[in-house]
Each structure stands twice: as structure tokens, then as C-alpha cells.
């Protein structure tokens, strides 16, 4: 069953294949059969030789199977080119279009003009019939709005601008003057040069710029006015497009102005090369095969055959139009054939044949011609197609060139001016600017005039400039020998690239402002200022080698330590001070308790010495703790017990550590250097973190601003600081000094100068974005190399180092700052004012306490006087009583004595008279206080120790008056005194025989 099914399906499968393939073959056969088999090629030629060669070429083409498919035949239809363009139009219609030509090959005599070829192009283009020109080189044929179907195997004249660029690159000329006629071709070659140079120099370091464009009317009679302008320009390289007749006038007048001699370079196009007065040494271009009509005819025919062959294989070609009277004819195949023609790239007799979008020949070869004596033309180079690289290549033999003035050495191509227009800008310490007074007529010897020109009213304000860059300029002008006029930047800016409305235009375009704009627009020759070298600026201007290497850094104000009245307390934290204060009183309390409860402290043993030291009370313990802490000596009692004394020793060690730590920390905190910066550098987290309350800024539009824009990792920081940016560096630095701006990011040279001038300012962190300051010059300036070499010599000789010391590091000011930094900081009144205030408070407290004590003492004295009066009265009364008692007792004893005597001896008489000589004491009249013999003061001093119960009596006084106690202040032991009552004293006598009762 499977085999039967397969056998049944095979016919169906084969039928399907046939049905699918048949339409394709039918379509191919239909296409091939629908295309014409014969093609008429028209020719509008200038002479019979060209007509004959055209016919021969067509015949040979039919046998070339590489270009002609089978069953396809080409036929030629030719007419003679008429000088009358109208007649030419009729001939094209009647003899070419009527014969259904598919394309037309056109040539004409060079002297007949381009009107007839243009007529052929207009007529054929109206019917979309392609036209291939072999001799028309005017720029007008490149306009596809007019010549819609025109191609040519020769390049237009303005394509020589491409060769000019190659020659300038070969000779390394960077500045040129272009001379061209004001016709279509002259303006076309200028436009081609400017347009092509934009892309040509993308990969070339040295760019040729047009210094001056001189446009003249064709058929001129004199070129003198233009030569005057050319002579004042720097460039001595002239690129000229002119007809042969105009070139004769230009060369004639240039010779009279001596502008065709030594040092000048003339590069001209083909027409000017054939002038009969072309100076010796002129270089010109000559198109290869320019006059080879036969070669161009053959190449045009084969290009056409190649296009038709490809078109036949791809699509159907409709028959060409036949009637010029039918204006409704729209031959689409003709338009398609024109596109196929433009895409051709073949190797022909005239070289590599290819076309651009305008149908103009590309890859055309040129000979570089050098004019010698007697108008001899010598080929010194070729501009030809390199098949290996598939591009054009310039080859010039420099040794064979004879330059103007019969020189073998290549001219510099530029006249180096010796008087330059210089610009600068105020930027301390590089440029100081001072306005001249009304009575001043000249600047100081170390200054140079630098007026500020007002662009609005063309007035000038007189200023004088001095500084680092001015000294450099003075030395530079001497070294490389130039004079100058110095002026200030008109807008006071270095310049940045901004969008701006063009004059008279509605569109925005980018342009440079400030110093850079003046240089780019060639209103200045040189910029002598602290101009940072960066890629954005180097694209538009030249820089010398750096005269000052620097980078970017951060300026901030030095952090100042706030000095308060309690600065002396800052070495310890508040918590530590509180703990110390608490510890003093806790230790005092523990000392008191240990001494009180110790068996060897408060309580004395019964057999202990009466002179043993007393135990420590609470007030003495507090005094002891403070005395040890403050190391003031201890004048009060010390701990008596062993346990309290151990604690006292530990407390003394604690006090020693605390005092030593305080002293050391005070020295470190107040005497050592303060921290120099708050920021560690550009990578400081506070700069990168936009949430921090830290303001930083730079100068808007400056090189530093451009640096931050380039750095992706600094984009967040730049967005934050962009709103704070300043117009000038001076404003930002002032705000840093005032504390309004915390960090100013700018060139290190300027900030180092500010830091050396003001000891309160400091640069933070390391340099970043390293670059250098260079002298700016115009692109291609002849002074670039000379300035660079001079600056290198200045570095080697030490001149730049001298300028650094003189201007940037600010001489003695920097030394003073260094001295300030090296000198140890000393404590001042700000730091220690609190200590003096503390002493003052202590003095005031002492005075207050003494006043209180005096008042209290007066009150006590009054009270004591009352007590003394009462005591005196009591003592007087007591003395009287004692006296009476004594007398009575004496009488009684006398009586007893007499009784005894009477009983033993004979009775006698006792005289009561007083013997004053024998008993002087008894002869004195005694008051109550002198009832006892002796001095009253001694009597009272002896009696007071027994008056312990009396109010107001000091225990210390009582203790001091005890027998055996040390005498006050002398440390001596008082002698033992009798404490017997007066009646038992030695002054008392039992002899009372002298008393009379």
C-alpha cells in the first residue's frame, strides 16, 4: 500500500513542480522578449574625427560579449555640434529623437562655449534621455534641477579644490588666500574647498584655514586694490581660480607688487596655467586626458553599454520616445537608465571611470605642473587613482620643484608679522589691572598699557597691567623679537562655547565668546593669560607648551576653634568633670566613715597616750580630698586608721592621673596646631553627597566648568554646584573669606596664591584634573613653534621658577604664613579667661564670706560683752564674798591659834596693824578680781579652764590652756601651774599675828 501510494503521488509532485517553475521561465522569457534588441546611441560631436571614432567604437562594442548580451545590437546616430544652440535643438529632435535614441554622447570645441551642449542637455533631459558629456566642465552641469539627465566623463573645474587640499597637506601649509572669479565656477570651487576641508581634516592634525577670500569680477582690468589687502595678510600661499584672460591681469599686477617672487606660493587651476605671463615657480593642475576626445568617447560608450546590460537583466526597458512634439511623454526607463549610469565604476582608457550623485566624474587624474623659464611646463607630481587602496593618491617630487625666485627650498608660505594684537584678562596673580588716573599719561615701569575696548561705542578705557603673565610677555617679546598692542578681554571672560543667534539669521549656532572667540574670529593674534589647555579649546585654537603646570584644587577657610570662657574645661568632657566632682565628695565621705568606725580611729584605747591624734571628722575629710586632688598640701587632719590611709593613697594616685591627663590634654587641645582643612579633597563624601549642607562652586563657562561636564562620575556634584557658580573667581574668593561659600573649586595656581597671601585660607586635598596654562594662538599661527621653544628655554633657565616665587608664592607673605604655621600656638586670654573669672569668683566669694564673718563676729562680740559684764559683776560679788569668808576664816584660825598659844606659851597681845614692808600684798587694796594675790590677768587665765560650763568658751582654747598642752603658735609646753585656791597658794601666809581683830 505504501509503495502504491508513492507511485500514485509521484506524477502529482512532478506536475506541481512544473506548474511552479513554468511561470518563472515564462516571466524570464517575457522580460527578455519585451526588451528591445536594437539600441540607437546618439552622438553630438564637434568634428568628423570624433564622429568616425564614435561609429567605430559602436561597431567594436557589438562584438564585445562582456558588455553586449546576445541578440542585442547597438547602432550609432550622429550629428555635428552647431554653435547655434537653437539649431542644435532642432537637429537633436529631427535626427536623434526621431530615431529613438536611448542616450546621447556630447562633445564640443572648448572655444565655442557651453550653450550648445546645454541645449542638448535641456532637450534630452525633457524626455529623460541620458546625456554623457565628454568635454563640458562647467559647474552649471552639476545642477540636477536644470540638467536632470546629464553625466560627464570629465570632472568639473571646481573639483580641483580636492587636489588643492591634497597639495596643502603635502606641503604642510596651514593658512591660505583664495582668489576666485565671481562667476558660478569661481564660487563653486570656493564652496567645494570649504565643504571638503571640513571632513578632509578630521583625521589630520594640521588644518589649512582660509585667511582671506578675494573675489573679483570676470574680465577685470586691474587687480591692484585686492593685492593691497593680500599684502597685509599673513599668508603667502595663493590658491587661484581664474580664466586665462583674468590670470594675465592678476599675474601682471602681482609682479608689480613683488608678490610673485621669493617667499610666495601660487597654486592655480588649469585655465590660469595657460596664461602667457605665468611667473616662474607657479604650481598648477592639468587634467589627464583632458583633450583626448577619442578616449572619452570610448569610455562613455562602454559605460552606457554596461548600464544597459545590467538594466536588461533586471527589468524591462521601454522604447525610447520618438516625437519631440509629444510633451506628455514620460519615459521612466530613461530615468532608470540614468541611475544605472551613475552607479558605473569601470576602468577605461582615461582611467577609473565613476560618477558622484551629480553625475560628475570622480577618480580623475591630474598632473602637477611646475612653470619653469620661458613658460615651460614640467610635471613634478601626479594625483591618480590607487587601485590597491581604491582611492586617489598624491605623489609629488619636491626636489624637482623650482619655487618662485628660483628657490629650491620650499617657502614657509606665511609672512610672520612682527607686530601682534594681544589680549589678556584680569586674573591675580597672573594679571593685575589698574585703572589709570585722570592725571596719568603713562604706566609704571613694570606695567604695560592694556586698554579695555568697548564694542558698543568703540571707545577705550585706559588701564595698566602687571603680573606674572606681563613679565612673561616682556621677556617673550625680547626673546623672539616681536612688538605688540595689549588689550583686555572685551567681555571679561575666558570664553565658552554657547548657542547664539547668528546676525540676520533665525537659527541658533554655537560659537565661542570671550578671549577664545576673539582668537577664533581672528580679531587677535595671541592670548597671554592663565589660559587652561583643554580639548574643547584645542580644537579651535593653537596652544604653546605649558608655561605653568597646574591642576584643580579646592579653596576653603581654615576651621577656627571657638574660644569660650570655659575653654580650660574642654580637655575633659562634661561627663568626666561631673564624675570627678562626685568622686571627690564620695571619697571624702568614705574616708570619714572609715576613720570613724575604725577601732584605731574614733575610739581611743584606755591606755593610749593623751596626746594621740584625733579621728578625722567630715569637714576635714572633704578638705583632705580636695587638697590631694588639687595638690595644694594638707593643713588639716589626715586619716588615722590604716584602711582610710590606704584609700587616701589610692585617691592620691587617682588625683595624679587625673591632673597629668588634664595637663597633657590641655596642651594637645589648646597649644598644638588646629586642623588645617575640613575637606579631604574632591573625593570627600560631603562633596559627593548632595544632601550635605555644603556649598561649593566654580566659575561658569570656565575650563573647570568644562572639566566637570566631561566627568561622568562628577555629574551629580556638578548639578548641585551649577546653580552656585560665580561669574568671576574674585567674587567666589571673597565669599570664601566671608564664610558664605564653603568650597571654591578653581585652578591650583590662583588658589595657592590666595592661600599664601591670606593665612586664614587653605587648599584642601590633592590636585586633580591636571593640565597647564598655555599661550593661545590662531590655528596655523607661524608664532606657535617660536613661542613654544622660548617657553621651554625659560623652564630650563629657571626664569619660570623665578616668576613663581615672585608672583604666585607672594614672597615675604608666604614666609610669614609659614612662620605662623611653624610657631606653636600659645594660650591666650580667650582660652584662659574662664580660669581668671573663676579666680575672680573665688575672690568675690571670699570677700563676701569675710563680710558675713565680720558681721557675725560683731554680733558675737556684742553678745560676749554682755556676758563679760555679767561675769564681771558676778566675779566682783563672788570676790567680796570670798574676801569676807577669808577674813572670817583667818580670824577663826587666829583665834584657834591664839588659843593654842595661850595654852602652851604666855599670853601676849596681837597687833592688828599692818606691816606693809613685810607683807606688801596684804597692804594693797584689792578689788573683787584681785581678792587672790597676783596679777588679775593671771588669775583669770588660771581660773578659765575650770569655767567649762560658761557659754561662748572655745574648746580649743580650753584645751590649749590645760596643763601640759602646747602653747599656741610656739609649740612649747606650758609650765605646770598651781590650781590650788588662792587661800592655799604660796602667797598665802598663816602668820596672822599682824592682823588686828
Curated annotation (Swiss-Prot):
Q: Which residues are sugar-modified?
A: 258, 314, 345, 397, 454, 481, 501, 693
Biological process terms in GO annotation: behavioral response to ethanol; calcium ion homeostasis; chemical synaptic transmission; ionotropic glutamate receptor signaling pathway; long-term memory; medium-term memory; olfactory learning; phototaxis
InterPro entries per UniProt: ANF_lig-bd_rcpt, CaM-bd_C0_NMDA_rcpt_NR1, Glu/Gly-bd, Iono_Glu_rcpt_met, Ionotropic_Glu_rcpt, Iontro_rcpt_C, NMDA1-like_ligand-bd, NMDA1-like_N
Per the UniProt entry, the signal peptide is 1-26
Q: What Pfam families does the entry give? A: ANF_receptor, CaM_bdg_C0, Lig_chan, Lig_chan-Glu_bd
Keywords, ordered alphabetically: Calcium, Cell membrane, Disulfide bond, Glycoprotein, Ion channel, Ion transport, Ligand-gated ion channel, Magnesium, Membrane, Phosphoprotein, Postsynaptic cell membrane, Receptor, Signal, Synapse, Transmembrane, Transmembrane helix, Transport
Q: GO molecular function terms here?
A: glutamate-gated receptor activity; NMDA glutamate receptor activity
Report the transmembrane regions from the record. 574-594, 652-672, 832-852
| Subcellular localization, as worded in the UniProt entry | Cell membrane; Postsynaptic cell membrane; Postsynaptic density
What broad class describes the main subcellular location of this protein?
membrane
* Superkingdom field: Eukaryota
Subunit structure, per the record? Forms a heteromeric NMDA channel with Nmdar2.
Q: So what family is this one in?
A: Belongs to the glutamate-gated ion channel (TC 1.A.10.1) family.
Q: What is this protein called?
A: Glutamate [NMDA] receptor subunit 1
